[in-house]
Amino acid sequence: RGIGGASISSMFAGGAIVGATPDGRHAGTTLADGTASPAQGRDTHGPTAMLRSAAKIDQSMCASTLLNVKLHPSSLRSREDLKKLGSLIKAYAAMGGKWIQFNVVGNSQLLEAQKFPERYRDLIVRVAGYSAYFVDLNKGVQDDIVRRMEVSI
């Protein structure tokens, strides 16, 4: 028996009806894209700080404490970079983190895909708790993902 969080895709519909929040989010704008994820533009202190913050939530009884992490492709160029990512994932699990997922795509690539969808039919992104072909998403969801990727690690 556990406690569930918000729906993994409620950030769009929910955000449209939720007022402004103390973290600076404006009324009517998209909510955070995961129950343990920082709000858009708030993940400014690096991945370690983000994981430590998310791990402060007691996830032992929660079935849906999703943490979305946005990474720029340049942050995973070498074998050493991949080892560091593996260490981050292990550290998050050791702190009690249950569900972490990644978007590894550059903002410029997403904007290019919006202009020339025929060139990017194979571009897959994490939306929330699911993956989708970017060019198959509606414009509002695409724009939200573009905004999320403006601040990536």
Feature map (PLM): residue ranges:
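Acidic, glycine-enriched catalytic cores built around paired aspartates
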Residues: 1-153
